[in-house]
Curated annotation (Swiss-Prot):
Lineage, highest ranks first: Bacteria, Pseudomonadati, Pseudomonadota, Betaproteobacteria, Nitrosomonadales
Family annotation (SUPFAM superfamilies): NAD(P)-binding Rossmann-fold domains, Siroheme synthase middle domains-like, Tetrapyrrole methylase
GO biological process annotation, one example: siroheme biosynthetic process
Record-given protein name: Siroheme synthase
Family: In the N-terminal section; belongs to the precorrin-2 dehydrogenase / sirohydrochlorin ferrochelatase family. In the C-terminal section; belongs to the precorrin methyltransferase family.
Species the sequence originates in: Nitrosospira multiformis (strain ATCC 25196 / NCIMB 11849 / C 71)
Gene assigned in the entry: cysG
Length: 472
C-alpha cells in the first residue's frame, strides 16, 4: 500500500479550508458532515459557500476569514485542505502545515499532500472509502459508483441497530466466537431483511426474542477444506470467499499465493503448514492432528490449499482423519493447477484433433528416478500433465522417449501459472530440459506433454510482463 487508510475523528475539532470556490465548498460540506468546526480562508466566496455560511455560522460550525492565507490561520487546526487555484499559495499552505505537523491535503496535487481524500460511500455509521492513491481519480469514481449500487442505503440503519444491541450481546455471550457467530446469523437472516424492507420495529422485536431464546451452548468446531486455485485470486469460488471470511483460524500451504492470503480477515490467526522438497515445515501427520485439535477447541478451521485439495493435495488423508474423530467438515473444490495454468498458457488439455484423453501424474523424484507407468504414458493421442515435475524433468523426458514417444513430441513447462509471474517455455521432449535449466525456472511449475502444446503459439492470450524472452 502507498497510503495507510484510516478514519479520523474530527468531531468538534477545527479544520481549515483555504479557497472560496466550488471545490472548496464540496470539501467544507464533507467536513461538516463529519462533525468538524470549519474555518474557510479566502478573499471571496462562491455562492454555494455563502449559502453554507448562512446556514452553519449561527450554529458555530462554520467560520469565515476574508483574507489571504497566513500561517497564523493554522494555529489550532487539526487538518488542512488547500483548494485555491494558485499553485504557489497551495505550496505555501502545504509547507506550513507539514512544518507544524498538521495533516494537509492539496486538491489535485498528491505531491504536496500528507494525506489524500478517498471517494466515499456513506451509509453512516458504515462508511466505505475507495482510493487509487491519486493514480486514477476516474477509476476511483467508477468503483465508488459500482459500490453505491451494491450496498443498500438501509445498511446504515442495520449497523445502527446492531450498535444498540452490542453491549447486550456482549453480556449475553461470554466467548468472542459465540458473539461473532450470533451476529453473522442475525445480520444475514430475517433481522436484516426486515430492516431492508423498512420494518424496523419488527426487526428490533425479532432481535429481542433471539437474545432471550439463544442459549450459550459450547461452540462446535468444524473444518473447511478449501481449494485456493492456482494463484489468481479471481479464480476463487464464491463459496471459498465466503468461508475465508468466516473462519476463526487458517492453516495454509506454500502454494497459496500472497494475493489470496491478503483476502483473509486481518484478525484471523494464520498457521503455515507448507511443504518443500526435503524440508517439511510440518509433517502431514502433524497437520492432521492440528486440524483435529483446533476443531475440538470449537474453532471454524479453514484448511486452505493451492489448486484443488483432492488432486495431489492430500486432502483425502486429512478428511479421513477428521471423519475418524467425528469432526464436521466440508470440501470446496478449487481450480486445479492443470486447468488453470494450461488455460492461461493457451494449451487446451483435450482437443478433437490431437488428444482424446488427459492424464495427471506427479513427477516427484525418489532416489534419482520417477516411478510412473511409462508404457501407459507413452501412448499417442493423449495429453500428460505432470505436477511437481521440475526437478525430475530430465528423467521424465528421457523415459517418455525411451518408451516410444518421438523425441520431437511437443512439451511445455509453465511456472507460477495464472499469476503476473507466469512464464511459459514451449519446446520438445528432447530440448525442454536444457532450455528449462538455462531459463532458471523455479517451482511451482507444471509440465504438459502432447500435440496440444503446439496450439500455445496460436492461443496464448495471457502475456504478463517479464515473460521468458523468446518463450512461446
Amino acid at each position: 500500500m502507498n497510503f495507510l487508510p484510516i478514519f479520523l475523528d474530527i468531531h468538534d475539532r477545527n479544520c481549515v479550508v483555504a479557497g472560496g470556490g466550488e471545490v472548496a465548498a464540496r470539501k467544507v460540506a464533507m467536513l461538516l458532515r463529519a462533525g468538524a468546526h470549519v474555518t474557510v480562508v479566502a478573499p471571496r466566496l462562491c455562492s454555494e459557500l455563502l449559502e453554507q455560511l448562512n446556514e452553519q455560522s449561527r450554529e458555530g460550525k462554520l467560520a469565515y476569514r476574508a483574507e489571504t492565507f497566513q500561517d497564523e490561520h493554522l494555529a489550532d487546526a487539526v487538518l488542512v485542505i488547500a483548494a485555491t487555484d494558485d499553485f504557489a499559495v497551495n505550496q505555501r499552505i502545504s509547507e506550513a502545515a507539514k512544518r507544524l505537523r498538521i495533516p494537509v491535503n492539496v486538491v489535485d496535487n498528491p505531491g504536496l499532500c500528507s494525506f489524500i481524500m478517498p471517494s466515499i460511500v456513506d451509509r453512516t455509521p458504515v462508511v466505505v472509502a475507495v482510493s487509487s492513491g491519486g493514480a486514477s481519480p476516474v477509476l476511483t469514481r467508477l468503483l465508488r459508483a459500482r459500490l453505491e449500487t451494491m450496498i443498500p442505503m438501509a445498511y446504515g440503519r442495520l449497523a445502527a441497530y446492531a450498535g444498540e444491541f452490542r453491549d447486550r450481546v456482549k453480556h449475553r455471550f461470554s466467548q468472542p466466537a459465540q458473539r461473532r457467530r450470533f451476529w453473522e446469523r442475525v445480520l444475514q437472516g430475517p433481522f436484516a431483511e426486515m430492516v431492508f424492507a423498512g420494518k424496523d420495529q419488527a426487526a428490533k422485536a425479532w432481535l429481542e426474542r433471539e437474545l432471550e431464546n439463544e442459549t450459550e451452548e459450547p461452540v462446535k468446531g468444524e473444518v473447511y477444506l478449501v481449494g485456493a486455485g492456482p494463484g489468481d485470486p479471481e479464480l476463487l469460488t464464491f463459496r471459498a470467499m465466503r468461508l475465508m471470511q468466516q473462519a476463526d483460524v487458517v492453516v495454509y500451504d506454500r502454494l497459496v499465493s500472497p494475493e489470496i492470503l491478503d483476502m483473509l480477515r486481518r484478525d484471523t490467526p494464520r498457521i503455515y503448514a507448507g511443504k518443500e522438497r526435503n524440508r517439511h515445515t510440518m509433517p502431514q501427520e502433524s497437520i492432521n492432528d492440528l486440524l483435529v485439535r483446533l476443531a475440538k477447541e470449537g474453532k471454524r478451521v479453514l484448511r486452505l490449499k493451492g489448486g484443488d485439495p483432492f488432486i495431489f493435495g492430500r486432502g483425502g488423508e486429512e478428511i479421513e482423519t477428521l471423519a475418524g474423530h467425528g469432526i464436521p467438515f466440508e470440501v470446496v473444490p478449487g481450480i486445479t493447477a492443470a486447468n488453470g495454468a494450461a488455460s492461461y498458457a493457451g494449451i487446451p488439455l483435450t482437443h478433437r484433433d490431437y488428444a482424446q484423453s488427459c492424464i495427471f501424474v506427479t513427477g516427484h523424484l525418489k532416489d534419482g528416478s520417477v516411478d510412473l507407468d511409462w508404457p501407459m504414458l507413452a501412448r499417442p493421442k493423449q495429453t500428460i500433465v505432470v505436477y511437481m515435475g521440475l526437478l525430475g524433468l530430465t528423467v521424465l523426458c528421457k523415459q517418455l522417449i525411451a518408451h516410444g514417444l518421438p523425441n520431437n513430441t511437443p512439451a511445455a513447462i509453465v511456472q507460477q501459472g495464472t499469476t503476473r509471474k507466469q512464464r511459459v517455455l514451449a519446446a520438445t521432449l528432447e530440448t525442454l530440459p536444457e532450455l528449462t535449466a538455462a531459463a532458471h525456472l523455479v517451482p511451482p511449475t507444471l509440465v504438459i506433454v502432447g500435440e496440444v502444446v503446439n496450439l500455445h503459439r496460436k492461443l496464448a492470450w495471457f502475456q504478463p510482463e517479464g515473460n521468458l524472452p523468446g518463450a512461446e
